[in-house]
Amino acid sequence: RHTLYCTMTYIMTFGIFAGFSAAFPLMIKNLYTPLDKSIDPLQFAFYGPLIGSASRVIFGKIADKTGGAILTHITGIALIILISGLILGGYLTPTSPDQFQGFLVIVLAIFFFTGIGNAATFKQFPVIFSESPRKAAGVIGWTAAVAAFGPFVFNVLITQSRAISGDARLFFWFLVVGCVCAT
């Protein structure tokens, strides 16, 4: 049972981080470059992973002192709010290049919080499985392997969402529900 919850929280953090790392430049290209040719996806592609990685390092030390559960919970709530804002703010169905700045801020904030959550969840696993370090190591390996599918799953499901509904909002609502369940 604990393995399932650990997997869900790690998918919420690292899975979203890895998925957005792959999908972020493509989203810019597909959503905003047609509205303004001067928006270059490659100019922004590395900022998200950089911010997420930096927040993981910085908040890893905080998670080591606090145990990680509170930071994971804060991350879940922040991701629910931010992803909902991406959908409800119209940033996934833009009508103006002026919306790009809001899109960029929200996505970079998502990267920031996934970095925090990534550090916090990895701190929790050895605590949750303190009776068996071997089990803790297995859970860390399992959750990392499952969450590593993030880039593949993100792009496949965004494509499917666009095929079904014409845009990616369906996938992102699914992501919100996943974050609610993991939080």
Task: Please provide the spans of the model-predicted regions.
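A membrane-interface helix-boundary motif in multi-pass transporters
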Residues: I158-C179
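Residue-level signature of mid-helix packing/kink "hotspots" within the transmembrane helices
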Residues: P49-V57, A148, F152
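Intracellular juxtamembrane helix-capping segments at the cytosolic ends
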Residues: I116-E131
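Juxtamembrane helix-start elements in MFS-like secondary transporters
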Residues: D36-A45, Q99, F103, A136, ...
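C-terminal transmembrane helical hairpin of 12-TM major facilitator-type secondary transporters
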Residues: G67-A120
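A late C-terminal transmembrane helix in Major Facilitator Superfamily
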Residues: S132-S165
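Extracytoplasmic gate region of multi-pass secondary transporters
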Residues: H2-S53, F122
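Helix-to-loop junctions at the C-terminal end of transmembrane segments
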Residues: S55-G68
